[in-house]
Amino acid sequence: MRRVALKIAYIGSNFHGYQRQPNYRTVEGELLRVFKETNIIEDTWTAHYSVAGRTDKGVHSTGNVISFITDEDIHINQLNGLLPDDIKIIGEARVPYGFKVRFPLTRTYTYIQPISPFEKKNLDITKMHVAMESFIGKHNFRNFSKRNEKNPNRKIIDVNLEVDEDVLIFTIVGESFLWNMVRKMVTSIMEVGYGKLDINDINELLKPKELRQFIRLQPAPANGLILSDMEYKNIKFKDSEYAKNKLVEFLKKEYMLHEQEKKADCRLIKILKK
């Protein structure tokens, strides 16, 4: 018997989140189906199965990690052949028996935010960068998650913003995150950029004085969020380039379908505005 860790990539669009649920298609449900078919896991309890991140419906991943104990050899290509096109195991690592997958040194999230070409001129990127700096360090993130969090304090290591034509790419690195925290951080930064919030509002949100929330933040849409990486002490994954390429092929097909819809929408807008 040995403990293994597997890095899982998936396109969350057609999943009802990671965690298995009766009558819903989930990432975990598909993985466990294949593991049981191949006798890698008989049941999750005896295999001491666990996962680093239980992502919500619509959220994607290139770096979620699962771990379990098995006496079977792991053949990634064989397992991927049994998995649907929108999930692939892209890495494997042998880990100590006592490895705790839920406690990485850092987690990295990426958020993809399209910029409307009709509102782009109203966006102040400079103010957004200033607002992002407010999140660095350890803060009380109660206003960026559920109100009843037992321990709302979290440490953010880095927040970065890349502008790529009509898309903003946020990269947020932290030790751990609360539910909806990243998506609400993105909302607040975007609202600073559009002048709906002031930078001082961000600072006030990070210092909640009472249970009443003076600004109610809506989480940014789930389909822009990617759980992109986990870093563990002294653990190095052996990645499968073949598995990554199979997922890329699937994404290229999906991209062209959505690109056609987007171009058609833009043309409709131009026609209607004539």
Swiss-Prot record:
Keyword tRNA processing among record annotations: yes
Enzyme kind, highest EC tier: isomerase
Presence of the UniProt keyword tRNA processing in the record: yes
EC id: 5.4.99.12
Residue sites binding substrate per the record: Y109
Keyword vocabulary terms for this entry: Isomerase, tRNA processing
Any Pfam family the entry gives: PseudoU_synth_1
UniProt xrefs under InterPro entries: PsdUridine_synth_cat_dom_sf, PsdUridine_synth_TruA, PsdUridine_synth_TruA_a/b_dom, PsdUridine_synth_TruA_C, TruA/RsuA/RluB/E/F_N
GO molecular function, one term: RNA binding
Active site residues of this protein: D56 (nucleophile)
Catalytic activity: uridine(38/39/40) in tRNA = pseudouridine(38/39/40) in tRNA
GO BP annotations, alphabetical order: tRNA pseudouridine synthesis
Family: Belongs to the tRNA pseudouridine synthase TruA family.
Role description: Formation of pseudouridine at positions 38, 39 and 40 in the anticodon stem and loop of transfer RNAs.
HAMAP family: TruA (MF_00171)
NCBIfam families: hisT_truA
UniProt name for this protein: tRNA pseudouridine synthase A
